[in-house]
Amino acid sequence: MQGTPAGGTSPGPSPMDRQTLLVFSLILAAALGQMNFTGDQVLRVLAKDEKQLSLLRDLEGLKPQKVDFWRGPARPSLPVDMRVPFSELKYIKAYLESHGLAYSIMIKDIQVLLDEEREAMAKSRRLERSTSSFSYSSYHTLEEISSWIDNFVTEHSDIVSKIQIGNSFENRSILVLKFSTGGSRHPAIWIDTGIHSREWITHATGIWTANKIVSDYGKDRVLTDILKAMDIFIELVTNPDGFAFTHSMNRLWRKNKSIRPGIFCIGVDLNRNWKSGFGGNGSNSNPCSETYHGPSPQSEPEVAAIVNFITAHGNFKALISIHSYSQMLMYPYGRSLEPVSNQRELYDLAKDAVEALYKVHGIEYFFGSISTTLYVASGITVDWAYDSGIKYAFSFELRDTGRYGFLLPATQIIPTAQETWMALRTIMEHTLNHPY
């Protein structure tokens, strides 16, 4: 059930209904071993100035942690979204009100959305089993995606192959799909999805994109020209341990699952673990933080695997890392406000890409450098790519702008993937036509 964006009220369950729902949710979570988020809300705060932003940043340092920022405090012009556990709602709302921080309720009860999501997945799974098919309009588990990859590669072995580039902390295979028409060391394009495990729309978009490539090769002139001259690599599940955990225990888990002696909290933010700007602004040295950068650059096997693979290949010309949510297309730098040397070219290309995206379903995206469009973030994928000589480095933030956040309904998978494809196609075509 959604809270009204303007901060008003909407009809809710009666006390008896709510008690019944709570009991049902707790039983369901216990049976499935999954965390329960009944009563948790997502609040949106729009800070007026830097002072109010500072007050919001103070919430991240509370011990024990009381909020989970979905969109962190960045600048006064950008909303801050945070999940607040039911047990902390009274405290957090009082804190906001006492400091004059106006808020609205974006999601009134997270568990309601989670139950709807789980029910939709179960329904889709039953249909897939009865028809022996794979639904591109549904969310899937790691095991289902792995099975799909094997079948997909077998069915399209003339153009697709599977490469294992490493193993995760929990020893899961890190797999990449390679799309190629033959030859060795072609110029290449890298696409990764799901580096933050709770961003399920990114995995689903990647899967749809992979199928789109094989479906349109030989029919779409632009794509055909790209694949005749270049290879495309897609890593669908960049954070396999975290992704598996979002299905088995905590749907809202962001980091990987690495464990270190003497540290109570688990996991590293894989998008803060890269060498470029490691440990700088927009990352955190606190292992309990959602943006914990890890003990050292590329300490995480999931990051090291990509670095080693791309470096050994030596001929990648574009890298696109796909995240959610906020509807943005961005380029380096994230670590500072310093413009990159080809800033104008990247700006114009991003503009063309979001215009192509808009034409599909009328969805508007912001675009620009990461540090000026979203926030300063150090140790991130695209900064590393650019500093490693990959000229066309971009990061997407897919749908939506906060109504559902990381819990985007499966009904939006296909539209999201369709529009994202047109932006990807634009970037890849430009990369093809501007060799370096």
From Swiss-Prot:
The keyword Hydrolase applies. It comes from Macaca fascicularis (Crab-eating macaque). Its cofactor is Zn(2+). Disulfide bonds join C265-C288. GO terms for biological process: proteolysis. The lineage of its organism: Eukaryota, Metazoa, Chordata, Craniata, Vertebrata. Residues 34-126 form a propeptide. Zn(2+) binds at H196, E199, H323. One of its GO terms (molecular function) is metallocarboxypeptidase activity. The gene is CPA5. This is Carboxypeptidase A5.
